[in-house]
A protein has these predicted regions:
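Ligand-binding clefts of soluble mixed alpha/beta catalytic domains
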Residues: 1-517
């Protein structure tokens, strides 16, 4: 009997259907019972309809040890390929938990490494949908070697193309290092966990009892460890978040983010005059200022639940993408501590890597005091902010909303470390320390010898405030470029970004700097 081309074509489609079925209907049903989508269902939700093209669908493992001989897993437990999100190309991999539990082996890793290389060669973001039981133990050191190839690419492509990790199931052991190197980590509440050592091993070694969710769930990594940047209650929601994030990002480090048309003008915002309390010690939510300044509905907060004393995120100003770094006076008076320093520094460096202008809204009392902070290394961590701002060459703007005291004033994009423009509201207090503390030191003798120390202290506090703790002293010495009407803040920032659009700034040649990690 003669075999013609059409029989071979039919055979091809049969094999494709087998690959697309993954681990089979029973395992797909189990995946759905856990409230989880399959690897391919996730891809369909992430990319624009009809744009996904699969790479290396027929790859299989080549291990013949420990019972794997004859057990072939379609695609070796990972789907790789490319597609479009919001009309722009991306590359991706999606681990298939229905095939070998998504465990990573030699060929599985090669598929991921290959698609990462393709993303870098073509200058497009890489998105990893992680759902894996870890290393494939049967393949031994080949699995570990596979992780190494992925970690290497995460590292060398860092700052070259945006890298996004979405944790959609377990991510344990060595597997966690790949997401940690990427730019943003998304997690799903109750179904995704990350940890190096699992609960059972921890209990055996230390006696501590804890659940997987309590050890490494979405809430833990978003609010406590800071290892994750976003969380959602469902996989559908988290993938929509990823699509939204990608809309703010350039394709690679040689491009700028897309500037979209904006009907909102660079107009007065009258509510800004009363947006924050005039009393410098009264708290408020800095998001009120953000919402008044940026394009309506454009602010996407990053690391929302971690280190809440600083707010960072992406937004648009008249259609142009900007990165915002803002003190949060309603938490710890906006003071900087170890975690907020790390949070801000990482975000600043990301924005600089991908040509996103930085805007700082400053209202800071200083670095947070305490033995725990000092012993925890606040000196080193605080220095990261100085380093991040100093090395950044994107347009850098600062608006001092109220307080700017001490070393924190210097660290938060002051003129001395490279700010292009610094604006201050007329109520701003710029000084080594707050008027209360300064008056107690400078005028200590007069206060103590006074017949009415409290009255004298109040007078001296006001005297210090009038003489030093105002924006005009700094403006007279060039440390503030202009004192502005709060209602003009949006106008001034838009004008400044337009002026700085073609900014170019070089740095001395070096292999790389030595950031105080």
């Amino acid at each position: 009997m003669t075999i013609d081309i059409y029989e071979k074509i039919n055979e091809l489609y049969d094999k494709r259907r087998e690959v697309e079925l993954g681990g089979g209907d029973d395992r797909i049903d189990k995946q759905h019972e856990k409230g989880k989508l399959t690897a391919r269902e996730r891809i369909e939700l992430l990319v624009d309809e009809g744009t996904f093209v699969e790479l290396n669908p027929f790859i299989e493992h080549r291990c013949n040890d420990f019972g794997l001989q004859g057990k072939k897993g379609p695609g070796d437990g990972v789907v790789t390929g490319y597609g479009k999100v919001n009309g722009k190309p991306i590359y991706l991999f999606s681990q298939d938990f229905t095939v070998f539990g998504g465990a990573l082996g030699e060929m599985h890793a090669k598929k991921i490494a290959n698609v990462m290389d393709m993303a870098a060669k073509n200058g497009a973001p890489i998105v990893g949908l992680n759902d894996s039981g870890g290393a494939r133990i049967q393949e031994g050191v080949l699995s570990l070697d596979g992780y190494g190839h992925i970690f290497y690419r995460n590292s060398i492509y860092s700052g070259v193309i945006p890298q996004i990790s979405v944790i959609m199931g377990p991510c344990a052991g060595g597997a966690v290092y790949s997401p940690a190197i990427t730019d943003f980590v998304f997690m799903v509440e109750k179904t995704s966990q990350m940890f190096i050592t699992g609960p059972k091993v921890i209990e055996t070694v230390t006696g501590e009892k804890i659940s997987s969710e309590g050890l490494g769930g979405a809430k833990v990594h978003n609010a406590i460890s800071g290892n994750a940047h976003f969380s959602s209650s469902s996989e559908e929601e988290v993938l929509a978040q990823v699509r939204n994030l990608l809309s703010y990002l350039p394709q690679n480090n040689e491009e700028k983010p897309e500037r979209i048309s904006c009907e909102q003008g660079d107009d007065y915002r009258p509510d800004l005059a009363d947006a924050i309390p005039f009393d410098a010690i009264r708290p408020y939510d800095v998001r009120i200022v953000i919402d008044q300044v940026v394009d309506e509905g454009s602010f996407m907060e990053v690391h929302k639940d971690f280190a809440k004393n600083i707010v960072v995120g992406l937004a648009r100003l008249k259609g142009e993408v900007v990165g915002l770094v803002c003190n949060q006076p309603k938490v710890m008076a906006g003071g900087l501590d170890i975690d907020s320093s790390d949070k801000a520094s990482r975000f600043i460096r990301f924005c600089d890597s991908f040509n996103i202008p930085l805007i700082t809204f400053e209202d800071v009392t200083g670095f947070f005091p305490g033995v725990k902070q000092e012993h925890g290394g606040i000196i080193r961590h605080g220095a990261k902010i100085l380093y991040a701002y100093s090395e950044a060459t994107v347009p850098k703007l600062t608006v001092i909303l109220r307080k700017a005291y001490g070393g924190a004033y210097v660290a938060l994009n002051s003129k001395s470390i490279g700010a292009d423009l610094v604006f201050a509201w007329p109520n701003a207090e710029i000084a080594v320390m707050g008027p209360q503390g300064a008056a107690n030191i400078i005028f200590a003798r007069e206060i103590n010898e006074s017949d009415n120390p409290e009255e004298t202290r109040a007078q001296k506090i006001e005297e210090y405030r009038e003489k030093f703790a105002n924006p005009y002293v700094a403006a007279s010495q060039g440390m503030v470029d202009d004192v502005i009407d709060p209602r003009e803040t949006r106008i001034k920032l838009i004008q400044s970004l337009e002026m700085l659009r073609n900014k170019k700034e070089t740095r001395p040649y070096k292999k790389h700097g030595n950031i105080p990690l």
